[in-house]
Swiss-Prot record:
Main location: membrane
Residues annotated to bind Zn(2+) 2: C209, C212, C239, C242
An example Gene Ontology biological process: protein targeting to vacuole
GO CC aspect terms: endosome membrane; ESCRT-0 complex
Domain notes: The FYVE domain is involved in the binding to phosphatidylinositol 3-phosphate (PtdIns(3)P) which is required for the association to endosomal membranes.
Name this polypeptide is given: Vacuolar protein sorting-associated protein 27
Limits of the VHS domain: 23-166
Gene that produces this protein: VPS27
Annotated spans, Disordered: 245-272, 287-316, 329-357, 483-732
Pfam families per the UniProt record, alphabetical: FYVE (PF01363), UIM (PF02809), VHS (PF00790)
GO molecular function: phosphatidylinositol-3-phosphate binding; ubiquitin binding; zinc ion binding
The keyword Repeat belongs to this UniProt entry's keyword annotation: yes
Domain UIM: 271-290, 313-332
Record-stated family: Belongs to the VPS27 family.
Length: 732
């Protein structure tokens, strides 16, 4: 039952006290005995249910079983609670819940004395033997109680398993009296007061006495006293009978304590008198004054004359001793003053001789060591105001003599300057000593300042580490470092890298894609590594028609129409160097600039699409209209003619930014040869496009790089077909 406050607060208080009593700062598995006794008082006072107290100790065992020292201190605390907390707590300790946890989990799993790992560790072996000794001791203490027989059964079970229990030297002295502890009694219920026998009602309410557990009215239970014998240190309600018993117990103890204090005070007075008498005798012997024989106090003196005589004798002896001690003290003081004066005179004479003999001597005089007194440390004499004024005046005059040549001769023979020189020269040694002293002090203060700064820095680092450990101010994710782009990646891409992407990528980058360089963070679209944007060279002036060429004759329009046909740069077979020559071929070709400041580069389809060249360029775009990159091989096919002869033009696909990709390691070694063999040459494509009689191109805003003609060497070039040139229209 919970009498004082809420049970949760009491539980927290008990857990904290258990943790402090078995703190890890206590060495060798010992206990903090005052805190441990507070734990036992808290359990014995029944402020918490006994099962809750047992579970608090069990929880502490579970928290400390991996540390042998903490486990030893916790086991000792459990043993102390068993011997001081009463029968209500023993019933919970002897339960199956606690004993099985102690024996089956802590002992047999972690500290089994039969295990070779435990035997190799001295600390674990000591803990295992401590558990066995405690179980054996508890079984002896609980042998006379049938309610606590489960501990005895656990002991017998371990004994049958051939565990060696330690022997006790005083086993016969252990009995049930070690666990007999006075605890608060259980409450008794009744309908009337046990003193006045008045029945309880709405007005006359009943109250329980914490000392005896009886029921009493307000009149006979209005007393509040602490019950220390029951482990209750706070004032609690008690009846009149229990109050009278408590007072009767305290009276003889107070009487005994008062008589004992009187006896001790008398003994102390006698001892002081004896010590004073001995001191007086010793002092009189030193001064060679005759000492009168001490008068024995034990002799019976009935007359008043003997008392006065002894008092007078004591007074005379005391006065003589005081006078002798004062005389010795005065002599010692006089001798000390004379020695001090003599030493000061010697130091002044020595210092004066050093100044007169050599004022360049910078050594500070060291006082001689005297056996009778400590050496006197002389402070460095500072300059007076007059001396400083003389020095400043001398410096000013000498400065004027050096700078002004007209008055230099007159000033050099001036008597005042000569007098100042005689005054200033003896001060040189004093100034030098002051300078040396100041420099030493400055060095000392600098060292102290450095030490204080170092200590402050170490303290701040220690405080920061503690704050980080406490509040978790730790950087969980390291800062993202952008990959550096080397010179190889910054250089211009080869024609191979511009025209053929990595295998498995057959579509361009979308227009809404933000390049990683604009955001500052690396992005990896499609699971590929980011490739920095390559610089694109300017297109030659003859590669695209200008605005002036568009206004010329219709004959020139036909030529411009031929030059605006999308052409594809097929690298020759010999332009693909081996793996070691990639860096040399990086700067062979350059891309021309695209119209409208947009980079729209078309690349070859992936390897798996060579069998079907009419596959869409952007397989993932379902909403856009699909186009064929190359026209069909048959120049005279009806499907291609119908497609190009239709009056309505198909919508132009929006331009997309192209991500330049480096050559993938998965590209077949003969991919270029296969591509040039499967696809027709560029001349055939131009002729087929001219025969289609279509006035517009599918991609008017797209231009493709044209490789140099001297490097293009197709393997098999089909014969060209003759196509008649259409006649120009006559304007009417």
């Amino acid at each position: 039952m919970s009498w004082f406050g809420s049970s949760s607060d009491s539980t927290i208080e008990l857990d904290n006290k258990i943790q402090e009593a078995t703190s890890e700062s206590i060495p060798n598995g010992e206990l903090d005995l005052p805190l441990a006794l507070e734990v036992t008082d808290l359990i014995r006072s029944k402020s918490l249910p006994p099962i809750q107290c047992m579970r608090s100790l069990k929880k502490r065992l579970g928290m400390t079983y991996s540390n042998p020292n903490l486990l030893s201190s916790t086991l000792k605390l459990v043993d102390l609670c068993i011997k001081n907390c009463g029968s209500h707590f023993l019933n919970e300790i002897a339960s199956k819940e606690f004993m099985d946890y102690l024996v089956d989990f802590i002992f047999k799993v972690h500290y089994d004395t039969k295990n070779y790992q435990v035997r190799n560790s001295e600390a674990k072996m000591n803990v295992g033997e401590l558990i066995l000794s405690l179980i054996k001791e508890w079984s002896i203490l609980f042998s006379n109680s049938s309610d606590l027989s489960y501990v005895t059964r656990c002991f017998e079970r371990l004994e049958s398993e051939a565990y060696n229990f330690p022997d006790f030297a005083e086993t016969s002295a252990l009995n049930s009296k070690f666990v007999d502890t006075e605890v608060p009694p259980d409450w008794v219920d009744d309908d009337k007061c046990m003193i006045c026998y008045d029945k309880f009602s709405m007005i006359n309410r009943k109250h329980h006495c914490r000392a005896c557990g009886g029921v009493f009215c307000q009149t006979h239970s209005s007393n509040f006293i602490p019950l220390v014998s029951l482990g209750i240190s706070k004032p609690v309600r008690a009846c009149d009978n229990c109050l009278a018993k408590q007072k009767s117990k305290n009276k003889p103890s107070q009487h005994n304590s008062s008589s004992h204090s009187r006896g001790t005070s008398r003994v102390q007075e006698d001892d002081e008198d004896e010590m004073l008498r001995k001191a007086i005798e010793l002092s009189l012997q030193d001064t060679q004054i005759p000492v009168s024989a001490p008068v024995a106090r034990d002799a019976p003196t009935n007359s008043s004359q003997t008392k006065t005589i002894t008092d007078e004798d004591d007074d005379e002896d005391l006065k003589a001793a005081i006078a002798a001690s004062m005389k010795d003290y005065q002599d010692q003081e006089r001798l000390r003053e004379e020695q001090q004066k003599q030493w000061q005179q010697e130091q002044e004479e020595k210092h004066h001789q050093e100044e007169q003999s050599d004022f360049y001597n910078y050594s500070i005089p060291k006082p001689s060591n005297y056996s009778q007194q400590l050496p006197y440390v002389q402070s460095v004499a500072s300059l007076t105001e007059e001396e400083e004024a003389d020095i400043n005046k001398f410096i000013t005059l000498m400065y004027q003599v050096k700078n002004d040549q007209n008055i230099s001769y007159a000033r050099l023979h001036d008597e005042k300057l000569t007098d100042l020189h005689t005054k200033v020269c003896p001060l040189r040694s004093k100034v030098t000593k002051n300078l040396i002293y100041t420099v030493e002090r400055q060095k000392a203060f600098t060292e102290l300042n450095n030490k204080i700064a170092a200590i402050t820095r170490l303290y701040e680092e220690h405080l920061d580490s503690k704050l980080k450990q406490t509040y978790g101010y730790q950087q969980s994710v390291p800062p993202v470092q952008l990959p550096e782009i080397n010179d190889y990646m910054r250089g211009p891409q080869s024609n191979y890298e511009q025209s053929i992407p990595a295998q498995g990528t057959g579509y361009q980058q979308q227009a809404g894609y933000v390049h990683p360089e604009t955001t500052g963070y690396p992005s990896y679209p499609g699971g590929q590594q980011p490739i920095p944007q390559q610089p694109i060279a300017q297109q030659p002036s003859g590669s695209r028609p200008s605005a002036q060429q568009a206004q010329k004759a219709p004959e020139q329009k036909h030529e411009q129409q031929q030059t605006s046909v999308p052409t594809f740069a097929y690298p020759p077979q010999e332009s693909y160097p081996p793996e070691g020559e990639d860096d040399e071929e990086q700067s062979n070709f350059e891309l021309p600039p695209l119209p409208n400041q947009a980079q729209n580069d078309f690349s070859y389809p992936p390897t798996q699409s060579y069998d079907s060249p009419s596959e869409p360029m952007y397989p993932n775009d379902s909403t856009d209209q699909q186009y064929n990159v190359y026209p069909p091989n048959g120049a005279g096919s009806e499907e291609s003619k119908d497609e190009y002869s239709s009056g309505e033009l198909q919508p132009v696909q929006p331009t997309r930014e192209h991500v330049l990709r480096t050559r993938s390691s998965e590209l077949p070694p003969h991919a270029v040869e296969q591509a040039s063999a499967r696809f027709p040459p560029i001349d055939t494509v131009e002729e087929e496009y001219q025969n289609s009689n279509n006035s517009s191109v599918p991609y008017p805003d797209v231009s493709f790089p044209i490789a140099p003609t001297q490097n293009l060497q197709p393997q098999q070039e089909p014969p060209k077909k003759f196509v008649p040139e259409p006649e120009p229209l006559i304007d009417i």
